[in-house]
Amino acid sequence: MIFSSAVAAFFSTNAAPFILGIIGGLLTNFIWQKWRDAVEKNAAARFSQKVSERLVHLSADFKDEILLLDSAGTHYLAENISVQVDEDLKFLVPCQADDVRAIAEAARGKAKPTAIAFEKDFVVPRGLTVEAIGSSMGIDHFRERLIAGSRATAERFVESYEKPGRFGEFNGKSFFLRGFTRARDPRGGDERTTFFLALGMTDWFTGLTLYNVYHQLAAEGHGIVHADESSISEKYNWFIRGFGVNVLAILHDGGKRYVVFSKRSGNLYNMRGKSRWHVTTNEGLTGQDLESDGRLDLYACAERGLREENGIELRPMDAIRFYSFFFLRTDFELGILGSAELRLSQAEFSKQARALARDNTMEIRQYAFVEFTERAIQEFYRRETEAGEEFTASARLGIEIVSARNGLNRLNT
């Protein structure tokens, strides 16, 4: 009786309609939010499924050049990418004494001594030998192959200082693969993918030497050329001597979006003597990206690449997103593909690249700004290839993957 009287008294007041209106509004908003979340979740699931189907076809089409190791349906979360380095685990190839002298003579007055410092003997993890490492990969005469490969690398160093138009090679910290694992959150959502990469320490000279040995083995028809995901991580991991962060910049300019391709110098080792169209920035992980806890930050590496190669400092509204991990067969390297959304005009980008980029004159010959539409990208690709220009596999796969995440149809690059 008392409760009924209280209810009746409430409804007789002037405040009742107002309070009921607030409650009704909150309830309506709650129901609307739940419905919208469900619609967006279903749309994201359909989009993720569409992207996954597209990636299956891309993986098959690029299988001779690139092996896709993992892809997020939307994009990776920063906390779900882990790169750990064991600084005590080292694999280093020496530079022969006479080659060291030849490099020093060619680089006299052009390079600091620390830039051309090399190991005097092989350095391998405790309990292993060079021969044992070679045997585990089914490679005979591995020590002799490495020494021969090191001499070819030394010749490259000498030429880089002697030939006009070349920039001097230098040695520095780099990393080799110990292994990688991946996992997907059972709660669902590809954005919850976790990718863990374990690395050991090496140097740039060793990396180039392994690059030479790999191509020799490939010419001999060694099984390394058919490496799959398992053997890359567990058998031939010693040859993974680099990790590249590949980013395509997308400019927001005058209400339109433009993707930026860079034409890389043919003097770069992975261009093999011919300038090619590539992603906007391709930065390798180095000692600069190593944090005090032994971890590497891929986002920091991408930001450094944009700054050093393109003169771009990220602004608060800019965003870097990573989509796919891959293995580049032609160079036996691991990499990650992503995009950088930049609030910059084409003119601003060009101005900053000319004025602020540290590596621009050495590595990049020119830029191409292409409207981010299927028709414009396809026309640019057709025009350039008909003119005899080439695109790297990373650039072709990269634009396909970035386009897929932005709702564009297959480009067939």
Segments (PLM) and residue ranges:
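Juxtacatalytic substrate-recognition/specificity segment
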Residues: 307
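Short, strongly hydrophobic alpha-helical membrane anchors
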Residues: 1-11
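Hydrophobic alpha-helical transmembrane segments
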Residues: 9-25
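N-terminal leader/linker segments that precede catalytic domains of diphosphate-processing enzymes
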Residues: 25-304, 312-413
